[in-house]
């Protein structure tokens, strides 16, 4: 599970050859959620309101990069790119 970003204690990562729809995973402490890249909604899991707000804000800024990484995740040897954290 390559880490692609980290900010305010939130870790963002993707799995290679993960299933559709395009999504990423966010972990904050003991909480973990799978987030749809397009809608920015939780598909599975949970995050606190504060963490989810930060994740959605970050995902809006980096949607193209997230989609690139998800496309890479489908390849036999993915080339994940690190994405800048939320400032």
PLM-predicted stretches and their roles:
Residues 1, 37, 41-49, 75-87:
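N-terminus-biased detector of the onset of the functional/mature region
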Residues 1-22:
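Short, charged/polar N-terminal "headpieces" of proteins
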Residues 2-9, 30-32, 57, 61, ...:
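Multi-pass alpha-helical transmembrane bundles in non-GPCR membrane proteins
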Residues 11-13, 34, 82:
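Generic structural signal for residues positioned in beta-strands
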Residues 15-49:
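A short, structured beta-strand/loop element
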Residues 37-38, 42, 52-53, 64-69:
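Short alpha-helical interface patches
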Residues 47-50, 54, 59:
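Short interaction-prone segments
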Residues 56-87:
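C-terminal structural segments of small proteins and small subunits
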């Amino acid at each position: 599970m390559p880490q692609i970003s980290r900010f305010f204690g939130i870790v963002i990562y993707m799995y290679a050859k993960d299933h559709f729809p395009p999504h990423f995973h966010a972990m904050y402490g003991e909480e973990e959620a799978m987030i749809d890249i397009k809608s920015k909604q939780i598909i599975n899991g949970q995050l606190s309101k504060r963490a989810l707000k930060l994740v959605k804000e970050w995902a809006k800024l980096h949607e193209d990069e997230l989609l690139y990484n998800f496309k890479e995740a489908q390849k036999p040897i993915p080339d994940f790119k690190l994405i800048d954290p939320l400032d």
